[in-house]
Amino acid sequence: MGKKRVYEFAKEMHVDNKDVIDIAKNLGIEVKNHMSSIDQDQEAKIKGMLSKQSAGKAPSSQAAKTPAKAAKTSSAAHKEAAKKPVAASAKSNDHADAAEHSQKNAKPAAKQENKPARSNKTSDGKIILSKSTILRPRSTQTAHTNTNHNRGGNTASANNTANGRNSNRSNNNNNNRSANNANRSGNNNRSNERNRNDRNRRFDNQRVTGPMPRAGRPTAANGNPRPVAGNGGKFVKPASERQQPKRQEAVKPANAASKRSEQPRTERPRTEQPAATTNQRFTKPAPVPAAAAPKPASAGSQDNRNSRRGGGNSNFGRSNSYGNRNGFNRNNRRNKKNKRRQQSAPKKEMPQRKERPLPETLIYEVGMNAQDLGKILHREPAELIKKLFMLGVMVNQNQSLDKDTIELLATDYGIDAQEKVHEDISDLDKVFEEENKNQDNLQPRPPVVTIMGHVDHGKTTLLDKLRHTHVTEGEAGGITQHIGAYQVKLRDRLITFLDTPGHAAFTNMRARGADITDIVVLVVAADDGVMPQTIEAIHHAQAAKAPIIVAVNKIDKPGANPDHVMEQLTEYGLIPEDWGGDTIFVKISAKFGKNIDELLEMILLEADVLELKANPDQKAVGTVIEARLDKGKGPVATVLVQQGTLHTGDPIVVGNTFGRVRAMTNDHGRRVKDALPSMPVEITGINDVPQSADKFVVFADERTARAAGEERAKRAQEEERKNTNHVTLDNLFETMKEGQLKEVDVIIKADVQGSVEALAGSLEKIEVKGVRVNIIHQAVGAINESDVTLAAASNAIIIGFNVRPTALAKAQAEQDDVDIRLHSVIYKAIEEVEAAMKGMLEPTYEEKVIGTVTVRETIPVSKVGTVVGGYVDSGYITRDAGVRLVRDGIVKYEGKLGSLRRFKDDVKEVRQGFELGLTIENYNDIKVDDQIEAFTMEQVPVK
């Protein structure tokens, strides 16, 4: 025959698959699981081993003769077990130890189902159980097989005694006692059910335990007599209670179960020892004393029947339901108690939302929705939507409402509706005019004086003299910072002076100074007289309607003629008081300080006549005199306060920028917290460099200032985009002409904003035919890397005025071949750019005849062409000159020389009166007496 599976062989032999696998492994047969195959020889070996083990573990057939005999045997076994204690088995069959095997009990024995474990008892008679034996599953099929074998060879009573099948009755008794007895102290299964429902469900039909008998209880819970110990320490049932042995039910000792009811589910009995390492399934059971004999457990089939009837130890049994029901009832009682307590407790009243009164007037904006109106009216949006629905208007809470709908809703509520008027906070000019016209709480203020005049007429010298005479007296450190504006004190009265440059490029700065000034001091040199910038300053002052005080300077110089200056100024409407006019003339010498105090007195006199006043209690407004980008402070602006008082921390909008005044510095370089009217200060804290002559206004809060500044910046950007020239049919021809023009791209960086504007204006006025200046970027501050990058991308020239490039910018410029020109004098910057513009024009060339040659002889040469021999009649002829062949006054050919020789040598030049030989490149039709003109193209300089 062929091979057979392990599970087929186990089925034939009525044994467990695991028993067959264990025997096969002991015999050295390779099997892995119940699906492994064995041949006939291996099958015979396993059969023989099964027969030997069945015969070896069967107890004597006379083991159950008398109870007294069993008691003696049990006593002997107790003595023997005390000498060699080992872990006791938790299964229904208590296995014998090594001492019992040594006695070689030869009595007939029935086949036993389980592998016996070694049993130990302590000195007080308690049995020590092993964890591994308590939880070891048991096969029902094996139990049936063993029982059938025992019936074949022995009586039913001996068979039950040998295999320990009395546990069925014991288990039933325990189950009955669990269901009927309210005292749980001795009820092992009931405690076990309450604490380990899940584990009982898994191991109901697989575990067999040996509970400890309780003293003084000779009968079971149902009144039946307890089984007595037979021969070999085994229990024997009465004949009437013998049943077919089934798979045994797991029963715990009573005392262990009572402890387990108070422990977590995962705990094990603490009095445990490891099970024996030897294979104990087929060893002989050890005798147990009668006092410590375990209660017999019921078979698995009986337990299954009990489970179906609702009894037994199953999770679906009666006792388990009873235990769970008690817990459920306890929870029910607790829940009902809590519910009654909650009902009897006083209920807290829910806070009611207070109805806020309606406003007297609804200030609305067109486009508001129901949510926005609900916040103003203190009503829910749903209420407003319902009202509008009743009024015939269908809207939702996010829909914008028009003016009529909002007024209709206000009328329904019985309140007035008023549309909110928006003010353009970004219109600084309007705010500036309103603040300047404020006539409340006016107080006298210092006059603002602007000094104007031509270059080198002594304006700066006069200011320096005023500062050193009236400012630095009593100042320890002197002037620490130059901000272009100063205050001079005379007789406890202050005068504010503004300096303006005299060069023609600074027209805007002069006009700006005239706009913000109260009095103009016109400085005219007595030796030079009236100059172009003097006339321009007069026009600016007259346009601003500012009174003019003429200071005739340099009267100490030889050749000075103040009267001639006065005569010249009368042509422009400046008539001296001595001549019947109203213009004040003061003859001074700024270098020596002559008549300086007289000039100051005249200024104060004119200020008294003007009655200059301002309100220091309102929000400050003023004008930017100068602005720059400081390396450490950031954007810095020099401003002149014209109305109100400027405080540190005020939210401010300056031109198209905004910020908060972080710090203020006066003309002495000292920090101040307040700036009164007519006081020049330098402020920091703005986010960008403003333009000169920009207005500044202080706002109530920073949020409004930010909104106004951002709006102004946005409008300025849009305006700049609008200024871009778009091509139309009207300007198409002009655009095409401009496209033919060459451009010089320039980037301007200067120290102050006024210099930037002056230099840009001067460069744009340079007139070179065919070339124009294109300023692609202008800013305040040092030349940085971004400027160099922009110049490299646009092929532009960087012009720095009183600034220097950073180290990184300089290195990058050298790497990118960017031209950086640094200047401190505006004349030189303008001249250099003008020269560059002229150099960008395409050069103009004109022809110049340098010599003539008369052909005397022609010699045709193969592979060379016609060789000409002749004399230089006039001038000279060079190798790289152009030639023109003229025959009878008609130009036959114009080209280049192919070669030029004198005798056999190649030469570069042949002068007049010398013979030569030459060839004309790519031309051979040359005849005797032809004239050859040599000429060159020379570049004509740009005028």
Curated annotation (Swiss-Prot):
Pfam families: EF-G_D2, GTP_EFTU, IF-2, IF2_N. It comes from Lacticaseibacillus paracasei (strain ATCC 334 / BCRC 17002 / CCUG 31169 / CIP 107868 / KCTC 3260 / NRRL B-441). The lineage of its organism: Bacteria, Bacillati, Bacillota, Bacilli, Lactobacillales. GTP binds at residues 453-460, 499-503, 553-556. Keywords: Cytoplasm, GTP-binding, Initiation factor, Nucleotide-binding, Protein biosynthesis. Transmembrane segments: none annotated. PANTHER family: TR-TYPE G DOMAIN-CONTAINING PROTEIN (PTHR43381:SF5), TRANSLATION INITIATION FACTOR IF-2-RELATED (PTHR43381). Belongs to the TRAFAC class translation factor GTPase superfamily. Classic translation factor GTPase family. IF-2 subfamily. Residues 35-359 are annotated as: Disordered. GO terms for molecular function: GTP binding; GTPase activity; translation initiation factor activity. Residues 553-556 are annotated as: G4. One of the essential components for the initiation of protein synthesis. Protects formylmethionyl-tRNA from spontaneous hydrolysis and promotes its binding to the 30S ribosomal subunits. Also involved in the hydrolysis of GTP during the formation of the 70S ribosomal complex. This is Translation initiation factor IF-2. Residues 499-502 are annotated as: G3.
